[in-house]
Amino acid sequence: MNTQLRSDALAAPMPDARGRFGIFGGRYVPETLVPALDRLQAGVARHLHSAEFQAEFLLELKTWVGRPTALSHAPTLSKRWGAEVWLKREDLAHTGAHKINNAVGQVLLAKRLGAKRVIAETGAGQHGVASAAAAARLGMPCVVYMGAVDVERQAPNVGRMQLLGAKVVPVTSGDATLRAAIDEALRDWVSDPDGTYYCLGSAVGPHPYPYLVRELQAVIGREARAQMLELAGALPDAVIACVGGGSNAIGLFHPFLADSAVQLLGVEAGGRGAGLGDNAASLTFGTPGVLQGSYTLILQDAFGQVRETHSVSAGLDYSGVGPEHAYLMQSGRVAYESAMDGEALDALAECARFEGILTAIESAHAFFGARRYAATHPGARILIGCSGRGDKDMPILQRTLLKDLAAERR
């Protein structure tokens, strides 16, 4: 069955006309949002792949974002792991993460659709920073909704958003993390669907967002594929990325889907363990359901109530996942596993100590997954998506890794 599904995944255009990836995806929203989503879908169809839009988008990526981002060989990790390790360096993009690719594209689209303001949600703060920066660049007001828990643990990014001119609104309802921030942004959009553009930060939500975000982020994988052929002389044996909502992973994976010899591996937030509420691994532990406008895999109880999640990483601390990831797992084309908090922090410390790269805690989950993969695939050529830099995580690292280091030195 999996072999046939893999073939279908490569042959069939996704999503279909209803915004479905197999059984996942679609659009489950209040009637008040249907006209806004219809306008967005029409705008995407009209503009996204037009020569004019692509020329402006690619120029912004080149001259402002700093693309293409580097592909770096990791010689010490390669030696330690017994593999050939390469890093796709989205941490080197303007604002410090992959989120800027999507934000620039969507704010350009917002202007073409006649929106007067941009709103966004954020977890780790990187999408908020990217949206604020893109809005400032293109002359639009910006409001960012952020869970109160994340406001506290990602304070540096809150200040960055404010300096970039955005209004940051802490959300105290629900679990006060990313899911609550998305809910609040959707409420704002419902109140003013004509004048407001919702710049959704991940490949989640109702159609056409999962498709739109994937198309804007696929520049990551297109660059990485060409760079691997140029610098490594071959495609990777495995491509590994962290997965929360899944935008950096789908952007990296998508251009490799047709390369059947390349294994694709997503690494979720395993948190404290397998118990409900102890992790944010919806592909590993979730069940099908509707979350924030999309049918996907979500962490819910036996009564269908979405449960709170836990991860040391704010950017992965989400109770669902993009519907295309749910489909790719079901199809067998992409494998998914999880890394626990301590495992991710250990991988972060290893990368910093031996490669001189302070990666984001989100990306550190992928680094741990890559180390685990290398242990069973000696000599493998591995490409890791370094989705962002770890500067934003210093408050968390002060309480965890640096505290442990200080204790060791006493």
PLM feature spans:
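Active-site nucleophile and cofactor-binding loops and adjacent substrate-binding regions
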Residues: R89-N102, V118-G128, G174-D175, Q217, ...
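A short, small-residue-rich loop immediately preceding and capping a beta-strand
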Residues: H94, A110-G147, L235-N248, L264-V267, ...
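Short glycine/serine/threonine-rich phosphate/pyrophosphate-binding segments
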Residues: G96, I100-Q106, R117-L138, E152-Q154, ...
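Active-site-proximal loop->helix
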Residues: I119, H127-A185, G275-G286, M394-L402
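Glycine-rich ThDP/TPP pyrophosphate-binding loop and its adjacent helix/strand module
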Residues: R179-D188, G195, V204-V262
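Active-site/ligand-binding loops adjacent to catalytic centers
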Residues: I182-P208, L212, A261, G266-I357, ...
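Claisen-condensing/thiolase-fold acyl-transfer catalytic domains that form or cleave C-C bonds
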Residues: V243, S247, D341-L405
